[in-house]
């Protein structure tokens, strides 16, 4: 079921870019675009502005996720993936990109740099206890189930 996310343009770095949209009927994410040109040297990370601020409905969040094509073709990913946009955040959405490749990568203003996925949030109530229920996995982590 669709939810309405209000969008405001911010930054005024040039003519308005098109609003994020789903590129296919089955797409989970809306494409976010760079609102200014940026070149990332190998190993460099940078916060890239999108020119958008959002009003996400209460009970929902936005997740900013990397685009797989950028990773495959250029070695570009996100430092904090996914990045979380809380429903009460009203500032400009930025994407922290990093170039893991061997060559500089340039994005023009308007290039697609990430995806925005809107989803529900479940808030937990924590209960402090003396013991936890046992499980088949126990305390094994960090690849322990792949032996």
UniProtKB/Swiss-Prot annotation:
InterPro entries: dUTPase, dUTPase-like, dUTPase-like_sf, dUTPase_trimeric
Swiss-Prot/TrEMBL catalytic activity: dUTP + H2O = dUMP + diphosphate + H(+)
Pathway terms, separated by semicolons: Pyrimidine metabolism; dUMP biosynthesis; dUMP from dCTP (dUTP route): step 2/2
UniProt enzyme class: hydrolase
Cofactor: Mg(2+)
EC numbers: 3.6.1.23
Pfam families: dUTPase (PF00692)
GO molecular-function terms, A-Z: dUTP diphosphatase activity; magnesium ion binding
GO BP term, example: dUMP biosynthetic process
SUPFAM superfamilies: dUTPase-like (SSF51283)
Binding site for substrate: 67-69, 80, 84-86
Swiss-Prot/TrEMBL keywords: Hydrolase, Magnesium, Metal-binding, Nucleotide metabolism
Similarity field: Belongs to the dUTPase family.
Its job: This enzyme is involved in nucleotide metabolism: it produces dUMP, the immediate precursor of thymidine nucleotides and it decreases the intracellular concentration of dUTP so that uracil cannot be incorporated into DNA.
Protein name: Deoxyuridine 5'-triphosphate nucleotidohydrolase
Gene: dut
């Amino acid at each position: 079921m669709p939810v309405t996310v209000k969008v405001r343009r911010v930054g005024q770095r040039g003519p308005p870019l098109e609003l994020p949209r789903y590129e296919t009927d089955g797409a989970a994410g809306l494409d976010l675009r760079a609102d200014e040109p940026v070149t990332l040297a190998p190993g460099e990370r940078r916060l890239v502005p999108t020119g958008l601020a959002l009003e996400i409905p209460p009970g929902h969040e936005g997740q900013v996720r990397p685009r797989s094509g950028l990773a495959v073709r250029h070695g570009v990913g996100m430092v904090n993936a996914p990045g979380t946009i809380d429903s009460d955040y009203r500032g400009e959405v930025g994407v922290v990109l990093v170039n893991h490749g061997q060559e500089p990568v340039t994005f023009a203003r308007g290039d697609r740099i990430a995806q925005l996925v809107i989803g529900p949030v479940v808030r937990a109530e924590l209960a402090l206890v003396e013991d936890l229920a046992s499980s088949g996995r126990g305390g094994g982590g960090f690849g322990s189930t792949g032996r």
